[in-house]
């Protein structure tokens, strides 16, 4: 690591911590030449393979941008979207390792978005799952209702 003060390449690690839910490592370093302390963040690269075969780095910003359109006019904050993108990244890393198909990212977005806002979920799902009729919406709404009934507290008799 280059020291930001003197550009020396020699430094020692003073402290290391896992951050961002295990996605990154924060290292506190000290330059061996000028003794300046500085912080570095190390993150493993998550590669996304798109439909056309092109591979690029995972982008939380792209997740946020895609979901933000579905959340337009809804009571969803930027912090909510950042949290969702973080959750999607963690889920994808846990399930697929260091490389994932773009389609699988879309699938990973659906559960946390459904928990965040069901209307935004339906909007996103309608595009992602290529809804072509009102019946597609009705089927998805029926699925949501069944899930609500399955999660409803039972009346203890």
UniProtKB/Swiss-Prot annotation:
Cofactor: Zn(2+)
Family annotation (PROSITE patterns): ATP_CONE
Cofactor note: Binds 1 zinc ion.
Record's protein name: Transcriptional repressor NrdR
Start and end residues, zinc fingers (unnamed): 3-34
GO annotation, biological process: negative regulation of DNA-templated transcription
InterPro entries to which the protein is assigned, alphabetical: ATP-cone_dom, NrdR-like_N, RNR_NrdR-like
Family that this chain belongs to: Belongs to the NrdR family.
Ranges for domain ATP-cone: 46-136
Biological function: Negatively regulates transcription of bacterial ribonucleotide reductase nrd genes and operons by binding to NrdR-boxes.
Gene Ontology terms, MF aspect: ATP binding; DNA binding; zinc ion binding
Domain of life: Bacteria
Organism ancestry: Bacteria, Bacillati, Actinomycetota, Actinomycetes, Mycobacteriales
Pfam families the record matches: ATP-cone, Zn_ribbon_NrdR
Key words, A-Z: ATP-binding, DNA-binding, Metal-binding, Nucleotide-binding, Repressor, Transcription, Transcription regulation, Zinc, Zinc-finger
């Amino acid at each position: 690591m280059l020291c930001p003060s003197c550009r020396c390449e020699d430094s020692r690690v003073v402290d290391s911590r896992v951050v961002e839910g295990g996605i990154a490592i924060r290292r506190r370093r000290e330059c061996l030449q000028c003794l300046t302390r500085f912080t570095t963040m190390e993150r493993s690269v998550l590669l996304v393979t798109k439909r056309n075969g092109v591979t690029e780095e995972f982008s939380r910003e792209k997740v946020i941008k895609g979901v933000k359109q579905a959340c337009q006019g809804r009571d969803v904050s930027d912090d909510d979207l950042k949290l969702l993108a973080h959750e999607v990244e963690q889920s994808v890393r846990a399930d697929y390792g260091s490389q994932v198909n773009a389609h699988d990212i879309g699938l990973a977005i659906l559960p946390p978005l459904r928990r965040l806002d069901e209307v935004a979920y339906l909007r996103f799902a309608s595009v992602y799952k290529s809804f072509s009729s009102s019946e597609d919406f009705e089927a998805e709404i029926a699925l949501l209702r069944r899930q609500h009934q399955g999660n409803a507290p039972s009346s203890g008799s």
